[in-house]
């Protein structure tokens, strides 16, 4: 329903340095609500009981609905003053890592542009429809590959419904934006699977186990005919192999 202009506007709520406290506590209800497929069910309780003289748009006089056109973007630093984000936060978010920039770089100029929420959703839906068969096959190949078997047997990790849903949403849009399927899959693997606490950063696996996983990933890339290399995933694996080997 886009009956009012504000309903067709993309609204972004920016939460800076989210992990100075613990998002799993203060943001938990939002994490749960944002995963609801039905926007009408994305409700946040403001009170245990109905509020007197509550605003008309509150559900049951005590719940506020998070509209589909409201997106949350949070920043998180990783240092001694912050808390580590829990798996459930990472797993429900789209993660972008901003690496340290030691050298100056030139920002590409772009003309300002405005996009309505409706136009974005339409573009996302078009990309998903056009690329669905391709992405479903890719995920099927990944699920049946030796790489996935090693994740399960050596790391006790699997894909799950959430990963599949995110991949079906994310990969087609990346392809429509000009990225390769290799870049899209690499980003998902690096942020979902290879990050510390999942595959890397552990003490109950050996460097040899990581080398075997690295080889399996390379083999999958070739068999699936994915463009480029899984650069982000490889960098994480190689850094952790050096750690376990006692090298800096």
Residue ranges and their predicted role:
Residues 1-248:
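C-terminal regulatory/interaction module of P-loop NTP-utilizing enzymes
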